[in-house]
Amino acid sequence: EDAKQAKDDFMANISHEIRTPLNSIIGIGSELLDAKVDDTTKEQLYDITVAGRNLMSLVSDILDFSELENDTMELVEEPYNITSVINDVVNMAHVWNKEKNLEIIVDCEADIPNNLLGDSQKIYRIILNLINNAIKFTDAGGVILFVGARKESYGINLMVKVKDTGIGMSEKNIDALENTYNQVDTTRDRRAGGIGLGLAISRKMIAKMNGHMHIESVPDAGTTVSIIIPQRVLTDMPLVSVRDAGDKKIIFY
């Protein structure tokens, strides 16, 4: 028990130590993006900034793994803008997709309330993990991100579906995701450069938020991951749909 606690403390401490220089890299990169530089330099700065955020996401995965294993993860309920969350995910997907040049389609229902109450960072991380996984294991074809909502007495069920035309998974590999730290298929993950945390951590995070994940997959044909997460709606604010969210537009392409 003491050894396990020491390991968990080490993981938490080292993760926090890594965050400090990463935040500096991301912050400086973001500031330089606003400076007057040529297009090539701006693109390089953008790639550095996004790569830093990507690495920060990996560090967060390590922290999440530790918190989930020890049942110490806390949810932060705060107002957030679902449009901003989806835009941030799509911006990251652009970077991941540069080399593969897959077709990425974003399909958002028009009547999703934009003023939600929940843990926006975890919602972002979950959707980001799904997109990352889809791009990582797809070499040809494309990825579709669907976002919708269904009204409930407590607010809405946020519905997200990510469908890809990638290498797929067997039923055995899908079942293996119940184990938080499981690479699903060592050869498969090594080929894609992953460590196998994304889907498994997302599933446990979704369960903690009283939601659920469903995976349908056919080897060599593709995978569809569907999630439903209950979210409250801020009824004391004007209801703004995703499609009418002012200057913060969802990116469709």
Q: Where would I find each of the regions flagged by the language model?
A:
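Helix-loop junction within the histidine kinase core
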Residues: S66-E77
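Primarily the dimerization/phosphotransfer
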Residues: E1-D34, R53
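Coiled-coil phosphoacceptor/dimerization helix of two-component systems
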Residues: I28, R53-F65, V85
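Glycine-rich ATP-binding loops of the HATPase_c
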Residues: N210-E216
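Disordered, acidic interdomain junction associated with two-component signaling
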Residues: D107, I156, K172, S226-Y253
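Short conserved segment of the HATPase_c
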Residues: M169-Q183
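Conserved catalytic submotifs in the C-terminal HATPase_c
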Residues: V76-N81, K98, E103-N114
